[in-house]
Amino acid sequence: DYVIAAVRQILKDNPIDYVKWDMNRHLTDVGSMYFEPDRQGEITHRYVLGLYYIMDVLTSEFSEILFESCSSGGGRFDPGMLYYMPQTWTSDNTDAVCRLKIQHGTSMLFPTVSMGAHVSAVPNHQVGRTTSLETRYIVAAAGNLGYELDLQKLSQDEMELIKKQIAQYKRIRRTVQFGAYYRLADPFSENQSAWNFVSEDGKQIVFSHVQILARSAYRIPTLRLRGLDPKAEYKNVETGEVFGGDELMYAGITIPRVRQDFSATMIIFEKM
């Protein structure tokens, strides 16, 4: 009740529309003088039930606020918490290359709309890797997109590019967050990662590909899209090129060779 009252007052007194609920330590050596020795195992379970109660009260009272759950370490996604908070901070590791595996695996169990995925500064604070703003965006745009950057350190060109990225994401957001998600290349076993989303009505296709390391001699990858109508035609919204659905699914898209590590491509198709 104390926690509820304290948080309630803060939310009432301030114009807050987003709360990240973080618990950056694990419960260790937990015990209670109240329970007998054979009931000590109940404590962590009761703790979680108490947390769910707090969430139930606060999210019901402040339904207009977006709550995001979070925790350090692995296993942070909890279906129980997702009942109260519709998204979770997927990982503190925001490096675009690492995120390929993180998001590939997380999406096996949880919807992409629940995966917090942000464009962060480079060199990355976790691994020290530098990737382009475009690659960071394309990887983050496979989840619930956000940016965590110091605007004072961005160039004017970067600011303009971010504006364009956000505008583009708004056009594909419904497809990415609620459409069908198809994995086309596995970053765990390949030197690439690729995926495509299909909107609920089948009218928009979002295809993305990331090359991890550039190589001198290799077979140029061809990716076959999935979930399309083989009898329909699809237009590349950027170039105006038109492809048959059967062509995209059975012949596939040939990825141009790029002599650069961590290069990425996104293509948006519209069903004609």
Residues of each region from the PLM?
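Catalytic cores of secreted or luminal carbohydrate-active enzymes
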Residues: 134-185
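C-terminal beta-strand-rich structural cap/linker in extracellular carbohydrate-active enzymes
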Residues: 245-272
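An active-site-proximal structural segment forming one wall of the substrate-binding cleft
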Residues: 1-21
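Carbohydrate-binding surface patches
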Residues: 186-229
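Glycan-recognition surfaces
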Residues: 1, 5, 45-152
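Conserved, mostly hydrophobic/aromatic
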Residues: 22, 67, 140, 207, ...
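Aromatic- and acidic-residue-enriched carbohydrate-binding clefts of CAZyme catalytic domains
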Residues: 1, 25-52
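Solvent-exposed beta-hairpin/edge-strand motifs
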Residues: 226-240
